[in-house]
């Protein structure tokens, strides 16, 4: 994995440098010992499809547990309502990641599959994660955050 350094112009035409976290691979089949697969879930913890199913079958997600760290996975609920209902769980995840710098979190495109949200809906929720060295985000999310 590698770090990205992007320059962005703000509305005042000043140059900003934003240190980028690693980009989450599009397909994750194997994790290193310290890596955590971050996926979209439902509050009931029924990990029946999409990234949730992968988390259950490969990375230790527990049926019946819809939030937080489980094995080498971390569940963020995305199926309970609109984007506003997802934000507190993303904020909680970011605080968890800050407290656990020994772990590296690979965030998938949560909410952008079965839950039916667009990258443009979800990416801004991760604005405060973009500079954290132990959180990788999907390229789609990074591009949207940098464009803001």
Q: What is each residue range found by the language model?
A:
Residues 2-148:
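Macrodomain-like recognition of ADP-ribose-binding/processing modules
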């Amino acid at each position: 994995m590698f770090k990205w350094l992007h320059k962005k112009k703000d509305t005042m035409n000043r140059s900003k440098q934003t240190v980028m976290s690693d980009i989450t691979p599009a397909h994750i089949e194997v994790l290193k010992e310290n890596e955590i697969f971050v996926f979209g879930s439902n509050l009931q913890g029924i990990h029946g499809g999409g990234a949730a199913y992968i988390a259950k079958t490969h990375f230790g997600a527990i049926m019946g547990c819809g939030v937080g760290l489980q094995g080498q996975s971390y569940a963020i609920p995305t199926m309970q309502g609109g984007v506003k209902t997802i934000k507190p769980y993303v904020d909680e995840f970011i605080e968890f990641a800050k407290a656990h710098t020994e772990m590296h979190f690979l965030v998938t495109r949560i909410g952008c599959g079965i839950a039916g949200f667009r990258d443009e809906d979800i990416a801004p929720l991760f604005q405060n994660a973009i500079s954290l060295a132990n959180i990788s985000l999907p390229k789609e999310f990074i591009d949207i955050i940098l464009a803001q």
